[in-house]
């Protein structure tokens, strides 16, 4: 299939017009179009009906018979390529889109119990968005927290992480999540588990210490050994598992133990597992064969928003086209 570095300009239009039956062409990256970026990233509040007059749509519409979207990973982007063509052309979802939505709907609508969410990493806004949805809906039987998410839970429970770690959290504005964490722990005390020990580096080696005895001047970069064992047991008993984010700074060999052993526990589990997000998939590939995972979602931001109960612009546009 030939490629042309033009998404919708004169060169692209000429090549499309020259296509013969059975031929195809790959057009340039839409993300280089100002319209595609500004409508989503610069908060230009355009409705899909307003996007029908954008250059992209006006250029390609006369050359199209159908609109097929297979990009669930971009489903959270309110851009002309994602939401405008559905109003003007016969529309269909691609096979990958169908698989992605079905896998996530399986988690959201029909999870087999016990359903365990493993939430870690540094993007704690993602974790807290999902946490609220799956706790309020009753879909999560248990949430295992690691990374910064787990440390926020510790702060919300009254533990001190020492000046180094607490300054790290505050300097990045992540302490704003402590209030939400306190509320979740109050409402769902038996559904959220946080680390009972953390790990730091001492003389080049990993050292685990109980959360009640954390030193003040250390930087904690992984869940501790006892926490790992507790989480492994919960994962082994789970029937449905969703994972987003690593347990620690696995890129550093000193702090890879938590992430590595959790992934191996998930791979060995008989439960149905779903993972997604770039960092999550990268971490999984380092330690396990992805064929041991029930479903690997290609999406990051779109997946998080979908599981957080937010209506995605693409999904809304596709449903409107059906109606």
Q: Residue locations for each model-derived region?
A:
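Active-site loop-to-helix "anion-binding N-cap" substructures in soluble metabolic enzymes
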Residues: 1-323
């Amino acid at each position: 299939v030939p490629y042309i570095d033009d998404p919708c300009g004169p060169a692209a239009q000429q090549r499309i017009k020259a296509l013969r039956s059975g031929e195809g062409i790959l057009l340039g990256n839409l993300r280089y179009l100002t319209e595609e970026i500004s409508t989503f990233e610069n908060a230009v509040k355009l409705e899909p009906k307003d996007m029908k007059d954008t250059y992209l749509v006006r250029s390609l519409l006369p050359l199209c018979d159908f609109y097929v979207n297979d990009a669930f990973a971009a489903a959270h982007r309110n851009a002309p390529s994602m939401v405008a063509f559905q109003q003007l052309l016969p529309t269909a979802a691609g096979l990958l889109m169908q698989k992605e939505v079905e896998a996530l709907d399986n988690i959201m609508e029909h999870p087999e119990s016990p359903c365990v969410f493993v939430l870690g990493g540094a993007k704690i806004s993602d974790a807290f968005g999902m946490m609220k949805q799956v706790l309020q809906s009753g879909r999560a039987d248990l949430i295992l927290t690691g990374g910064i998410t787990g440390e926020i839970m510790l702060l919300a429970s009254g533990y001190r992480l020492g000046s180094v770690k607490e300054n790290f959290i505050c300097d990045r504005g992540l302490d704003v999540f402590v209030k939400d964490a306190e509320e979740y722990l109050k409402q769902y005390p038996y559904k959220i588990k946080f680390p009972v020990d953390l790990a730091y580096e001492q003389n080049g080696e990993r050292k685990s210490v109980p959360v009640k005895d954390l030193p003040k001047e250390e930087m904690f970069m992984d869940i501790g050994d006892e926490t790992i064992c507790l989480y492994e047991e919960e994962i082994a008993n789970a029937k449905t598992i969703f994972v987003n984010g690593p347990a620690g700074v696995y890129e550093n060999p000193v702090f890879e133990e938590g992430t590595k052993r959790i992934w191996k526990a998930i791979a060995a589990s008989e439960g149905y597992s779903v993972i997604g997000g770039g960092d999550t998939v990268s971490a999984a590939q380092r330690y396990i064969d992805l064929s041991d995972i029930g479903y690997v979602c290609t999406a990051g931001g779109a997946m998080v928003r979908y599981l957080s109960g937010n209506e995605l612009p693409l999904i809304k546009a596709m449903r409107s086209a059906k109606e």
